[in-house]
Every structure is written in C-alpha cells, then in structure tokens.
Amino acid sequence: GIGAVCAYLEERYAEAVSLDQLGGIAGLSKYHLLRSFTKQKGISPYRYLETIRIARARKLLEQNVPQIEVALQTGFADQSHFSRFFKRLIGVTPRQYADIFGGRQA
C-alpha cells in the first residue's frame, strides 16, 4: 500500500522513480496510486520525494558537504537544478543555508 511506497521513497530518494514503479509497489494503477497517495498524505508522491531529498540535503549542508556532492547524493541532476529548487522550497540558497547552519568558522 501507500506505506510501502513511502518506505521505498525514503530508502531510494536519490534514484529516479516513476509512477509505474510506485504503482507496482502499491499494487495500484498510476492513477489510483496518485489519488490514494495524495488523499492519505496531502501531497503527491513526487512532492513527498522532493521533501525527503531536501531534508537530506539540509543535513548534508549542515555537515559542510560541498554543494555539488549534496546535489548528486540527493538525486538532483546537477548543482544548478538543486540550487534553484532548494531556494524555492527553503527560501535561501544552499550556500546561504550552509553559511548559517554549517559548522564553518567566521
């Protein structure tokens, strides 16, 4: 069911995932998966995946992992896409976030 889909996404957040794959895990068609998931979680499976990726990215940035590494480890195609998406969701750039929350010395 939907719980299995969530577990799959949490474990494989860095991989490319399709609705067909997720439907297979849940035993539902793409359409029914999308409806059921959104009804239960309040967000789409893709938004859920993005949320997991950004949460992981925040942890890595706090550990001073370079942005390009963070982007690649969290499933983004490149640093540019990661930076734009991070800023849109969090409100600051990854660099600003790392400066604020990372373990850097001033």
Indicate residue ranges for each PLM-predicted region.
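A general structural signal for short secondary-structure boundary/capping elements
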Residues: 81, 95-96
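Terminal helix-turn-helix DNA-binding modules in bacterial transcription factors
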Residues: 7, 11, 15-20, 28, ...
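Conserved phosphate-binding and hydrolysis motifs of nucleotide-dependent enzymes
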Residues: 42, 75, 86-87, 91-94
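Extracytoplasmic/periplasmic copper-protein system
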Residues: 3
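Short hydrophobic/aromatic patch on the recognition helix
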Residues: 32-33, 37, 81-82, 86
